[in-house]
Each structure stands twice: as structure tokens, then as C-alpha cells.
Amino acid sequence: MADPARAAKLAQRIKVVVAEALGRKVKDPRLEGVTVTDARVTNDLQHATVYYTVFGDETAHADAAKGLEKAKGVLRQEVGRNITVRLTPTLEFVADQIPVVASNLEELLREARKRDAEVAALAATAKHAGEADPYKSDAPEDVDIDEDDFDEEDIDLAGDDDIDEDANKDADSSK
């Protein structure tokens, strides 16, 4: 097992070598619109997966896949010359799905912006369901209510006859 950092460096180097070889060595017209986007190498450095995109329609994608399979031997030979490992890894070419996913995300974002604009338009013309200040007091505004303005007749704690102090004294003396 190789170090993951070494595998990542090797994958990066394979990506560059394959991209350069597609531009210089391979003269297949089916591979003109091919762009190498990424490469991954297994930890044992025996297999490399090269991801690519193709500019064009579905027939261009199918032609590019056939062209890459046909050029696999030449590309592997070029990779073997330009990297320093004991065994040259086998190459596998996989069409990259990032452009498809990106276009789907752009469509979803476009739809979200459209819905946000609709909600903003509704919010601009909307009115509150109740009054502007739902916590408004029912008391007239010219009356000043002060909590310290209670009279002694309103609350008479001094003359409270409900408290039986003698019962408390009897309970303490029985102990």
C-alpha cells in the first residue's frame, strides 16, 4: 500500500500526462473535444481512473468513449514513460458527470430565484392581518398609570385578621 499523498500526486501527474498526450500524440478526430478533468489512483498504484468531459452532443460522447478505448494502449505507454513507478497502472476512462450535475443545479437555482421573486412581489403588496401594534393597551393614552399609586385602603396588610400569631407561638413551645 502506498502513501495516500503519493497516490494523489501520482494521480495528478497521470492527469497531466494523459491530457498532454491527447493533445500531441493521439491524432484521433473523435478526441478533439475531450478534456481531462480528474484522475484517481488506487492505493496500490495499479489502477488509474481518468475522468473526462466532451464538448458536444450524445454522439460526440459515444465517439469519444470509443476513441479513448482505442487509444488506451498509447496513453498507458505514455504514462509509463513519464511517471516513476515500478508498474504502470492500467487506465480506465470514465465520463465525468460534473457538467450534468452543474446544469441541474443551475436549473434548480434559477427556479428558486423565480420563486423568491414571486414571494417578494407578494410581500410587497401584503398587509398585516391585525393592527400595526398588537400590544397596544386599551387604556386611554392621557391617563398615567403608576404602580406606586396604590392607596392603603386598596391593600391593607397591617390589619389582616386572618393571621393567628398565637398558633405559631403554641407550636414553638410544644417542641
Curated annotation (Swiss-Prot):
Task: Outline what the protein does.
Answer: One of several proteins that assist in the late maturation steps of the functional core of the 30S ribosomal subunit. Associates with free 30S ribosomal subunits (but not with 30S subunits that are part of 70S ribosomes or polysomes). Required for efficient processing of 16S rRNA. May interact with the 5'-terminal helix region of 16S rRNA.
Q: Write out the entry's keywords from A to Z.
A: Cytoplasm, Ribosome biogenesis
Q: Cellular component GO terms, alphabetically?
A: cytosol
> Compositionally biased, Basic and acidic residues: which spans?
128-139, 166-175
Coiled-coil portions = none
In Gene Ontology terms, what is a biological process of this protein?
maturation of SSU-rRNA
The entry's family comment says: Belongs to the RbfA family.
- Segments of this protein annotated with the region Disordered: 125-175
Chief location of this protein within or outside the cell: cytoplasm
Per the record, where are the segments of Acidic residues compositional bias? Answer: 140-165
Entry's Gene Ontology molecular function annotations:
ribosomal small subunit binding
Q: Which domain of life is it from?
A: Bacteria
Q: What do we know about how this protein assembles, alone or with others?
A: Monomer. Binds 30S ribosomal subunits, but not 50S ribosomal subunits or 70S ribosomes.
Q: Where in the cell is it found?
A: Cytoplasm
The protein's matches in InterPro entries, at most eight in alphabetical order, are given as:
KH_dom-like_a/b (IPR015946), RbfA (IPR000238), RbfA_dom_sf (IPR023799), Ribosome-bd_factorA_CS (IPR020053)
Q: What is this protein called?
A: Ribosome-binding factor A
